[in-house]
């Protein structure tokens, strides 16, 4: 029997049923989910290289026979991925981003082609074979990657398109009573060339399998298109035999009942009093469409999507997408859908001000879109298509422009649109992702435009706008994004000539991927949001991406960790590039997500002082639809981090609730600032009442204002002249040996030693995009210049292996001066460090002057010092920015106040260990020992008013940099306190722009002034 179907470039074959909506029908159905008999073969039977893969005497398709003995097979759950079952018994996952994990030789695949044979029996009721049944269909919602189906030994057909539904007509093969279903699934096929998305390759039947009895007089398909322009319209499309009529449409809440006696009677229905649907007010109406034989239930949302000039409008109002790219991924189940988890995913998005989702890069499980309708999101629904691996071949042979693949690509788009066309949340169709360009993509767009006039078509790779409706880019720099928004810019856009560039500037612009969220970062999110505020053409974007794709794994000794590329011994892989989410694999929100939440909040707050010294609060409602009646403003006043007053305000103005698009200014009660220290006024916008996605009091945004009076200059001890005699070995709570600290507040310590190194972040390791260095990023549209990663530059400069040479240890009056010089082997550059220790009462003053030599041609990761402490130092409280880590280009969500946490809570458990835990703008930090206060360090601003930051860790930055996973960090007998005069920014160069020059740390002289005493 031929196996040519594996390399067939078509969309599938056999008794395939035309694509239709995923409908909630009362027609009889039978779920075939559950335990199936399963075996895994190393290659596909019947292929030239298969050899003796089958047992002696077993023919290629004997597995389909009812007499075949599968009693020795294993049992495997459906839905599932076989590579995630039985601890690797059936192979392991493979992660690639762009690379194909097989030779690029389309449409062929390797002989090593894992093939899973599935068998199960099931009973079909006798009633399904009565005259009231028109057809029996078998539906697969997701199988990776190509599969052949048999029922009772009869070949039914071949399915393709891993994340797309496929139905087969099995009417002739089924019988009353016991039946046998056999499915042969191949991991690799011609279809794999179309599914090169940045994710794990996870074969198997991973979505639902269902048998359906289609009734005589049933409704084959229903599409209720809705519009809203002050009143509502339903434009129905009913696919059914004439004998199915009359057909009735009911919307009980609207008192609507319309009966169509024949297909010719089906016509639009106008509704005067109807509330519109939006992502903020996801108003849905229960509806049904019924014939005598079948009733279909739907939930209708009335909205109109329209592009007017360069504006993308829903219900006549501009949409700003504060979105995320969302893969279907779970640490335990892979792409197997779980409704409770999906609902919590969406609720978490809402809590963090995410209002939009791009379904990267395929349709999700259909129930996910029901939830998006219900909770309220703008959705770009993307087709299951990516051919990114052909980029390495300069797109030669790319299926997007090869006529042999045309039917498969258009079929994929048809099944995408037809399945999900009833969803109010879907406001755009997307042809796919990173598949170059070509005639087949244009054909997909043409089919979509002809089929659905109510939604625009998106595809980022259509740089010139030849066949799509919006201008979309990924990872454009700040200068380039600025030029896209400007009406007076004549700069050529990517892939465009002057005429094409001008045309693209007449369209709505979205960033379909931006602020790549890999590891610690992204930085400078606010720069993009500022441009969205500034230029009407810009409509926001979609963060890459929502969730890390780690797979929960255990070491031989049972230690749990989240695996990424290479952890399963893949031949080729792309490492931890799959760990690039705003939430970690265990759903923990990252500091980057908190930063994003604050920056994109639609309730924007700003505090100012008027001429009389009273605080004014400006509240801007940047929502699409909703007024702010659901928002309460809570203010508080804190003196030196301690709350002294608090109250509430409403967002109502003279004309009632603050409407979408409006702003108002409120005057707060008179606040008396403390004569000494710091007084901070903070205001939070919180939910008045609980919603489907958050409790009452959930914060939406926050702002602060420093009300502190000018403080007298701090009398900082200046370096004194040395005096005769030996340097002291004891100064208050500290003892020294040869100028080095050896005990502090009764505990052994070491340091302080200069630290310029940080464990490189994923962005520090990125080099796919240019570096800014000393160049002005506006000169070349922000592309930067080709350069090694910052991490490589730092290592080449030896910043991770500085050695110390003590030049001088001298006694001071009541103090000690230590002069040292730090440099790396084979480096001509150094850093001079002078420590001045002086005892004043029970306080030990420490002034550290750090001065790099001339000639450093790089940015520094940090400028600071490290203190090695005993391991019983296990936490900290502080007055400064918090409670989460913060960096120069990621400070918007940091609130000045008193914060605290254990050592573990102070750091983020990123999938690949890296720099974490820096807390900015510190006034004081109090370290705990075994949970009790031990040491207090007060940090004073330098001459320019700049305050230091701190971090507390169990491992040195050098140890962290060497560990592939958290569990591979060495056991430590210490805790390490880093006191940083400055830190380098984060950027997003893992896949995006470098650190913006304003936040880059140039080699420069810095000073730390600290006051230390026992707590």
Swiss-Prot record:
* Residues annotated as the enzyme's active site: 434 (proton donor), 513 (nucleophile)
PROSITE patterns cross-referenced by the UniProt entry: GLYCOSYL_HYDROL_F2_1, GLYCOSYL_HYDROL_F2_2
Q: How does activity depend on pH?
A: Optimum pH is 7.2.
Q: How does activity depend on temperature?
A: Optimum temperature is 30 degrees Celsius with o-nitrophenyl-beta-D-galactopyranoside (ONPG) as substrate. Has high specific activity at low temperatures.
- GO terms under cellular component: beta-galactosidase complex
Provide a Gene Ontology MF annotation, just one. Answer: carbohydrate binding
EC number(s) reported in the record: 3.2.1.23
Give the GO biological process terms.
Answer: lactose catabolic process
Q: Which cofactor does it need?
A: Mg(2+); Mn(2+)
Q: What reaction does this enzyme carry out catalytically? A: Hydrolysis of terminal non-reducing beta-D-galactose residues in beta-D-galactosides
In terms of SUPFAM superfamilies, this protein maps to: (Trans)glycosidases, beta-Galactosidase/glucuronidase domain, Galactose mutarotase-like, Galactose-binding domain-like
| Expression induction or repression | By growth on lactose.
**What domain of life does the UniProt record list for this protein's source?**
Bacteria
What keywords sit in the KW lines?
A: Glycosidase, Hydrolase, Magnesium, Manganese
The intrachain disulfides are none
Q: Which family does it belong to?
A: Belongs to the glycosyl hydrolase 2 family.
PANTHER family the UniProt entry points to: BETA-GALACTOSIDASE (PTHR46323:SF2)
Q: What is this protein called?
A: Beta-galactosidase
Which organism does this record belong to?
A: Arthrobacter sp. (strain B7)
